[in-house]
Swiss-Prot record:
Protein name as it appears in the record: Transmembrane protein 184C
Organism phylogeny: Eukaryota, Metazoa, Chordata, Craniata, Vertebrata
Xref: PANTHER family: ORGANIC SOLUTE TRANSPORTER-RELATED
Organism field: Gallus gallus
Pfam families, sorted: Solute_trans_a
Transmembrane helix in keyword set: yes
Transmembrane regions: 15-35, 46-66, 84-104, 177-197, 210-230, 252-272, 285-305
Sequence similarity: Belongs to the TMEM184 family.
Length: 445
């Protein structure tokens, strides 16, 4: 029998805190014992200091994740948020392990790098799901806007048509990095096994240089598409304060990447040389260790920023339903990713064959993260929800969009804002939007 809101929300947080304290009582003595056993040098001190930052980082991140699971009232918004919040503990833990065991750093760091692409994808999903719920006629709204020109350095390229074309290309631009990064990571592992990777050495005789260039181009284009997407829909996204969220994601991704490039340049020009390896086996190991140490420190600051930027407070409701198991299971559900990739591949195929693409945004109902998220709906959602199968995962519809609530409503409204009568207001505005859209099209022609 699943644990309901009547009990599990009361004991889950104290239980997690207790488990973390027990973990500290086990891990801290082991780290101190390891520090006393080894010769205390730069490498050992760096590993121990990084461990202190790790122990401060993880509880901040886990608390935010736990609070979202406890108040899991908006699955289509909170699922990508939880995935983004996992970035900090994954980055921090991977870097600390790689710092301790330099020989396996290449294998541990690959997990961190793949999750980086996953985070960018989920941020796009978060924005898309919010807009889909808030504005059922989003394509018409975009078509009614002035033509958005490309941003530097692509300002000389032809502009993307406002509407479905722009949405499709922005989302495809983000999704391509989710595919490219794991692919290049697998290539990097193979090159390391055959001895041609040579990480941290800028030379066109090794594979690392080419993979860095490819990853950088793919990452920059993904971030460019995110910026262009925000530029077009800035007014519509203002209620969820996307700038702080975007900076949190962008800073972690870009800072970690470019500081690795900077450290590699320091190795190339001889600032980091064989004369000072500080207990590491090689100069490349020094570069990797320095990168891992800096990431452990940075993740503590990132955890604080994520805690405030991706707060759980807008999702707190007085009458919350759902089981502990469903909330936990939904966090690990990746069916939307498979559906997104399949849908984008089909859309690309339709474009190549000259067939019409499937519309991204199906009609939905209004939702707002801060105000209407907590407001009461006057419409009875029971009749609407009865036609939908109950599932904690929801049903995929478009780019990462789920429309089925966590639980089927009984006497209280489902997630506030999803079945909101204000959606009718948006629907009624569609003739005006269509009229404005046609005028914009005539002006552009």
């Amino acid at each position: 029998m699943p644990c309901t809101c009547g009990n599990w929300r009361r004991w889950i947080r104290p239980l997690v805190v207790l488990l973390y304290i027990v973990g500290l009582l086990v891990v801290v003595p082991l780290c101190v014992w390891e520090l006393q056993k080894l010769e205390v040098g730069i490498h050992t001190k760096a590993w121990f200091i990084a461990g202190i930052f790790l122990l401060m980082t993880i509880p901040i991140s886990l608390w935010g994740i736990l609070q979202h699971l406890v108040h899991y009232t908006q699955p289509e918004l909170q699922k990508p948020i939880i995935r983004i919040l996992w970035m900090v503990p994954i980055y921090s833990l991977d870097s600390w392990i790689a710092l301790k065991y330099p020989n396996i750093a290449i294998y541990v760091d690959t997990c961190r790098e793949c999750y980086e692409a996953y985070v960018i994808y989920n941020f796009m999903v978060f924005l898309s799901n919010y807009l889909t719920n808030r504005y059922p006629n989003l394509v018409l709204i975009i078509e009614a806007k002035d033509q958005q020109r490309h941003l530097p350095p692509l300002c000389c390229c032809p502009s993307w048509a406002m509407g479905e074309v722009l949405l499709f290309r922005c989302k495809l631009g983000v999704l391509q990095y989710t595919v490219v990064r794991p692919f290049t990571t697998i290539i990097a592992l193979i090159c390391e096994l055959v001895g041609v990777y040579d990480e941290g050495n800028f030379s066109f005789d090794n594979a690392w240089t080419y993979l860095v260039i490819l990853n950088n181009m793919s990452q920059l284009f993904a971030m460019y598409c995110l910026v262009l997407f925000y530029k077009v829909l800035r007014e519509e996204l203002n209620p969820i304060q996307p700038v702080g969220k975007f900076l949190c994601v962008k800073m972690v991704v870009f800072v970690s990447f470019w500081q690795a490039v900077l450290i590699a340049l320091l190795v190339k020009v001889g600032v980091i040389s064989e004369k000072h390896t500080w207990e590491w086996q090689s100069v490349e190991a020094v570069a990797t260790g320095l990168q891992d140490f800096i990431i452990c420190v940075e993740m503590f600051l990132a955890a604080i920023a994520h805690h405030y930027s991706f707060s759980y407070k807008p999702y707190v409701q007085e009458a919350e339903e759902g089981s502990c198991f469903d909330s936990f299971l939904a966090m690990w559900d990746i069916s939307d990713i498979r559906a997104d990739i399949s849908e984008q591949v089909r859309n690309v195929g339709r474009t190549v064959l000259g067939q019409p693409r499937k519309m991204f945004f199906a009609e939905d109902h209004e939702q707002n993260e801060h105000t209407s998220l907590l407001s009461s709906s006057t419409q009875d959602p029971i009749s609407d929800a009865s036609s939908m199968p109950s599932s904690p995962m929801g049903h995929y519809q478009g780019f990462g969009h789920t429309v089925t609530p966590l639980t089927t409503p009984t006497t209280v409204p489902v997630v506030d804002g999803i079945y909101n009568t204000s959606a009718t207001r948006d629907t009624e505005e569609s003739p005006e939007l269509m009229h404005n859209s046609s005028e914009k099209a005539l002006d552009r022609s």
